[in-house]
Amino acid sequence: KKLLALVVAAGFAVLSTGCVKIVKIGEESALTGKVEFNASDSVSGLWEEARANIEGKAVDLPVFLQEAGGDLKSLADKYGKYSMGTSGSISYAVKGSGTVLEVNQEKKAGFMIVKPDGYDGPEIIKIQIGSIYKGSSTRDTLDIIDYGNYTNQEEWAAVSQELHSKIDTDVIQAADPTSLSGKTITFVGTFTADGNDELLITAVDLEVQ
């Protein structure tokens, strides 16, 4: 009886304390089976589809500005996409051509000022040239992804950052922005309607004529 009691007690102790497995930081996926999110791989996989999506919905910039009549948010239902379903910031996809009046790289958030062909309105048209890119209009304009495709806000933000990295490498630097002053360009891009005086466009396609 004493031996049986000892065996039972030992078994109870094992069940009570359980078995603890130490998992090293960075090796969690081996235990859980969950693959760590890689924003660079994610964006590389959707990049060409993303460009096609934006190019397919882009509105001619002169047409857009004329229809807006000085109120960029007024075309939200016709051309825009909200950042949060039916609310939040409004982003648009546009395309056009024009002459580069100025290339400004005094700050890291560089830009070009473009005089668009076919439009003489007061709005200032800027195209971002990096190295820092403001906003998230490229991501927010896309119809092929949304926040629900990602686990958390960190992943969603990382997608926007990687889109900007891809744009900087494949689109902007490939066009050698420092050499573009006075030249004619064509572009496809996105912008968020933050005001009515200025459009800050993030290009997904930029060609020098």
Where are these regions (language model features)?
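Sec-dependent bacterial lipoprotein signal peptides
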Residues: K1-T17
